[in-house]
Curated annotation (Swiss-Prot):
<protein>
    <recommendedName>
        <fullName>Undecaprenyl-diphosphatase</fullName>
        <ecNumber>3.6.1.27</ecNumber>
    </recommendedName>
</protein>
<dbReference type="GO" id="GO:0046677">
    <property type="term" value="P:response to antibiotic"/>
</dbReference>
<keyword id="KW-0997">Cell inner membrane</keyword>
<keyword id="KW-0472">Membrane</keyword>
<dbReference type="GO" id="GO:0008360">
    <property type="term" value="P:regulation of cell shape"/>
</dbReference>
<dbReference type="GO" id="GO:0050380">
    <property type="term" value="F:undecaprenyl-diphosphatase activity"/>
</dbReference>
<feature type="transmembrane region" description="Helical">
    <location>
        <begin position="92"/>
        <end position="112"/>
    </location>
</feature>
<feature type="transmembrane region" description="Helical">
    <location>
        <begin position="63"/>
        <end position="83"/>
    </location>
</feature>
<dbReference type="GO" id="GO:0005886">
    <property type="term" value="C:plasma membrane"/>
</dbReference>
<keyword id="KW-0133">Cell shape</keyword>
<feature type="transmembrane region" description="Helical">
    <location>
        <begin position="118"/>
        <end position="138"/>
    </location>
</feature>
<comment type="function">
    <text>Catalyzes the dephosphorylation of undecaprenyl diphosphate (UPP). Confers resistance to bacitracin.</text>
</comment>
<keyword id="KW-0046">Antibiotic resistance</keyword>
<dbReference type="GO" id="GO:0009252">
    <property type="term" value="P:peptidoglycan biosynthetic process"/>
</dbReference>
<keyword id="KW-0573">Peptidoglycan synthesis</keyword>
<keyword id="KW-1003">Cell membrane</keyword>
<keyword id="KW-0961">Cell wall biogenesis/degradation</keyword>
């Protein structure tokens, strides 16, 4: 792979991993239009590591808070001491919600992955992009109300995790579906976006660990295209994530819907020719 190809794929990965337009849907469409074969596993894993790093940096304060809170909670459990502050209580609850949401994601995601070769057809991708667009469009009616972490129930976390598992289907945007689900379930905008991206961390790590098993059984080669692609995915992904969080908080999440409708329609047309 040429270095410029690595950069281009890094840009696509960085943008579509976080913006609610479906990274898998774009991958299938680009491969079909340009006759590109699936990227080497090591290159694909490297791109995802770049976008994962972007999430870790953007949400480093939340991750640090949860780590400290869980640590203090463990000490308190054995020492019979209650958590020290409201911040500890919030960190413990947020960590628990992520665990609850990750369980259905893992079960449903792993189940669908066993038959994912059946899903990568252009008509299906087009139809799922239309579904994504519809979900995004419906969020325009969500006002600024809703609950934060304090009112966030485990049931809500479970259903958002289910939605994330379904995002294995190409054309369904993970961020779009989970943020929309959070809004529909009564979360406020900031909490819906915050939980969506925190919930994606164990999902990405789990998927990459599974890929690493195959990776180490093959031949991995670090070249310039891989390095540039990973760095590009990180930089572009960081910027895309910051922009998307601001858009969600401003109540303009639905603005991505027309793009999904147009791309979904074009994909359906190409797939059924």
């Amino acid at each position: 792979m040429e270095p410029i190809q690595g950069v281009v794929l890094g840009i696509i990965q960085g943008l579509t991993e976080f913006l609610p337009v479906s990274s898998s849907g774009h991958l299938v469409l680009v491969q079909h239009l340009f006759g590109i074969t699936e990227p080497a596993l090591f290159f694909d894993v490297s791109l995802h590591m770049g976008t994962l790093l972007a999430v870790l940096i953007v949400f480093r304060k939340d991750l640090g808070m949860m780590a400290v809170s869980v640590g203090r909670g463990i000490v308190a459990m054995f020492g019979g001491i209650a958590p020290r502050s409201d911040r500890d209580a919030e960190g413990l609850k947020l960590a628990l919600l992520i665990v609850v949401g990750s369980v259905p994601t893992a079960i449903l995601g792993l189940g669908l992955k066993q038959v994912d070769h059946l899903f990568f057809s252009l008509p299906l991708v087009g139809a799922m992009l239309l579904v994504t667009g519809t979900l995004l469009w419906l969020t325009r009616d969500r006002d600024t109300g809703g609950v934060g972490v304090s009112g966030f129930s485990k049931g809500r976390a479970f259903w958002i995790g289910m939605v994330q598992g379904l995002a294995v289907l190409p054309g369904i945007s993970r961020s779009g579906a989970t943020i929309a689900a959070g809004l529909f379930l009564g979360l406020d905008r900031a909490t819906a976006a915050r939980f969506s991206f925190l919930l994606c961390i164990p999902a990405i790590v789990g998927a990459e660990l599974l890929s690493a098993v195959d990776l180490f059984s093959g031949h991995a080669r670090l070249d310039l295209a891989t390095v540039l692609g990973s760095l590009t995915a990180f930089v572009v992904g960081y910027g895309a994530l910051k922009v998307l969080i601001r858009i969600v908080q401003q109540g303009r999440f639905y603005l991505f819907a027309p793009y999904c409708f147009i791309l979904g329609g074009v994909t359906l047309w190409i797939g059924m020719r």
